[in-house]
Amino acid sequence: MAAAAVARLWWRGILGASALTRGTGRPSVLLLPVRRESAGADTRPTVRPRNDVAHKQLSAFGEYVAEILPKYVQQVQVSCFNELEVCIHPDGVIPVLTFLRDHTNAQFKSLVDLTAVDVPTRQNRFEIVYNLLSLRFNSRIRVKTYTDELTPIESAVSVFKAANWYEREIWDMFGVFFANHPDLRRILTDYGFEGHPFRKDFPLSGYVELRYDDEVKRVVAEPVELAQEFRKFDLNSPWEAFPVYRQPPESLKLEAGDKKPDAK
């Protein structure tokens, strides 16, 4: 019954619209609402504009952190997108992270990401990056430190529990050792994997390849074999529309090793 009532009202609206336009010399057209995009969407900037007020506030807070922890803070900078970066000594991981988490003017209680960057040309090739978030002040900060292949860095699990699996991933991918980690083992690669794939000196082909051996009924690891003595690229394909125009028959015979017949 409700559907029938709605249909009757809709039909009455059509008849009413046609009656209004009758006798005016114009065709009876039912105008339907059209959804239009706002004009402001086209003029909206695609890049975040520079906020000078926020830039000054972040610079002042960075200087404040450097004054309180001068032993560990080595450099403070604000990026063009108003992101504060603090570069610290490797010995200051725990003190700096604890300060940023507990201080009244910081309250960076969330570790949103922890990663590493490999720059082989540097003496300390690995850069460890901590990205922190303060919900209290709606602000972010990036803490950077450095290490090499042999020097361990203090684990941040005692400050942020979320650093547990992040540090395992860095150990697995880059080979950076975190001291005092509760369970530092590989997390992405397979058991017995050799090397660390995210290092710049790691070969693209890897060191071993895995395959299923039907004789032993299990997956086995073997050295990578990519060498080929001879590779012949046959450009003719039966799936092409005009395969005969790809290469003349004479060149095919010459490629196969036949001698060119003497011209008579």
Swiss-Prot record:
Main location: mitochondrion
Record bears the keyword Membrane: yes
Superkingdom, taxonomy of origin: Eukaryota
Cellular localization per UniProt: Mitochondrion inner membrane
GO biological process: aerobic respiration; mitochondrial electron transport, NADH to ubiquinone; mitochondrial respiratory chain complex I assembly; proton motive force-driven mitochondrial ATP synthesis; reactive oxygen species metabolic process; substantia nigra development
PROSITE patterns from the UniProt entry: COMPLEX1_30K (PS00542)
Catalytic activity: a ubiquinone + NADH + 5 H(+)(in) = a ubiquinol + NAD(+) + 4 H(+)(out)
Known EC number: 7.1.1.2
Transit peptide: 1-36
GO MF annotation list: electron transfer activity; NADH dehydrogenase (ubiquinone) activity; NADH dehydrogenase activity
UniProt entry keywords in alphabetical sequence: Disease variant, Electron transport, Membrane, Mitochondrion, Mitochondrion inner membrane, NAD, Oxidoreductase, Primary mitochondrial disease, Respiratory chain, Transit peptide, Translocase, Transport, Ubiquinone
Gene Ontology CC entries for this record: mitochondrial inner membrane; mitochondrial matrix; mitochondrial membrane; mitochondrion; nuclear body; respiratory chain complex I
Membrane topology label: Peripheral membrane protein
InterPro entries named in the record: NADH_DH_suC, NADH_quin_OxRdtase_su_C/D-like, NADH_UbQ_OxRdtase_30kDa_su, NADH_UbQ_OxRdtase_CS
Record bears the keyword Transit peptide: yes
Enzyme class label: translocase
Family statement: Belongs to the complex I 30 kDa subunit family.
Subunit comment: Core subunit of respiratory chain NADH dehydrogenase (Complex I) which is composed of 45 different subunits. Interacts with NDUFAF3. Interacts with RAB5IF. Found in subcomplexes containing subunits NDUFS2, MT-ND1 and NDUFA13.
Known disease link: Mitochondrial complex I deficiency, nuclear type 8: A form of mitochondrial complex I deficiency, the most common biochemical signature of mitochondrial disorders, a group of highly heterogeneous conditions characterized by defective oxidative phosphorylation, which collectively affects 1 in 5-10000 live births. Clinical disorders have variable severity, ranging from lethal neonatal disease to adult-onset neurodegenerative disorders.
Record HAMAP family: NDH1_NuoC (MF_01357)
Role summary: Core subunit of the mitochondrial membrane respiratory chain NADH dehydrogenase (Complex I) which catalyzes electron transfer from NADH through the respiratory chain, using ubiquinone as an electron acceptor. Essential for the catalytic activity and assembly of complex I.
Protein name per UniProt: NADH dehydrogenase [ubiquinone] iron-sulfur protein 3, mitochondrial
Organism: Homo sapiens
Gene that encodes it: NDUFS3
